[in-house]
Regions:
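Hydrophobic alpha-helical transmembrane segments
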Residues: 1-164, 176-217, 225-295
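Short acidic/histidine-rich active-site segments
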Residues: 173
């Protein structure tokens, strides 16, 4: 990574923006959470303004915040930082035992740290710093257009991503589920101006479902199978109690289909294949649940 620094052109455009799908044929994620949140708000209409707000919400909740998280979590710059630190001259980092009063010693230490950052750290991660800065500015700018609450949710999402980067994969998966399901859903629901406490309950349950799917790709899969089934069963029961028996039946049928797929999963233990097979049922469950709040 650090070798690419010297190969960069000296003149030309400053920034590069690349948009591409990060996962082939995978729909369950922030974009779908935004759509379901917009539907759950009851404010999504067949009008040009609603379509524009939905596009801005997807751009914020998936593209920009996802890019922020990806830049922060990518391992390349962390490995490059470690290699650069190993090759750093000793005078950059050794302690200052020189004479002088405390103010002069402090000034020399600060000067050494500044040179270390400028000469060692910035050449390695300057692209990431610039990228995160620009993405943060764009995300907050869109948030300002969409409303004050969206700005707060955007700042919260950025903070969640930063905290996730300091955790291991198992514990960080909880924050990833919040980042990719709960916050995009709430952003869309806030954008369209309607809020229901029952919707907040549903988004928390679907965040748990998403966390369970992430867990199936790691260790202790049967534990997450149980959580996945229990969470969707709760959704079906709450829908039935909320006088939406048709949607409750649809959710129950989707859960039954997943249980049938689980019999195959117990044999081959292929979590990735199982998630790819059952995600369509969860997509329908999320959308139908959002519709049930207002129809």
């Amino acid at each position: 990574m650090e070798e690419s620094y010297s190969a960069r052109p000296l003149v030309g455009r400053w920034l590069a923006l690349e948009l591409r799908p990060t996962r082939p044929l995978t729909w369950l994620g922030p974009s779908w959470a935004v759509i379901c949140g917009a539907v759950a708000s009851g404010g999504l209409q067949l009008r040009g303004q609603s379509a524009l707000l939905l596009i801005f919400s997807i751009l914020l909740g998936d593209v920009l915040l996802g890019a922020w998280r990806a830049l922060w979590l990518q391992p390349d710059w962390r490995d490059a930082m470690r290699r650069a630190a190993v090759n750093t001259p000793a005078w950059y980092i050794e302690s200052d035992d020189g004479g002088g009063n405390a103010v002069r010693r402090l000034a020399r230490q600060l000067s050494r740290r500044f040179r270390y950052v400028r000469s060692v750290i910035l050449p390695v991660i300057d692209s990431e710093i610039i990228g995160m800065t620009m993405i943060g500015v764009l995300a907050l700018s869109i948030g300002v257009v969409l409303g004050q609450t969206v700005v707060l949710l955007t700042i919260g999402a950025m903070g969640v991503a930063l905290i996730e980067g300091q955790m291991n994969e198992e514990r960080g998966a909880y924050l990833r589920a919040v980042f990719e399901i709960a916050l995009p859903w709430l952003i869309a629901q806030t954008v369209f101006g309607y809020f229901a406490w029952l919707s907040l309950f549903y988004v928390l349950v679907f965040t748990l479902v998403y966390r369970a799917l992430l867990g199936l790709l790691g260790g202790r899969p049967m534990r997450w199978i149980l959580w996945n089934n229990l969470a969707q069963l709760i959704v079906a029961l709450v829908l039935f109690a909320s006088h939406a028996p048709a949607v409750a039946g649809l959710v129950a049928l989707g859960l039954l289909a997943q249980v049938l797929w689980q019999s195959r999963f117990r044999v081959n233990r292929d979590g990735r294949a199982y998630v790819q097979c059952v995600q369509s049922y969860i997509l329908v469950t999320m959308l139908a649940t959002g519709l049930a709040l207002w129809f």
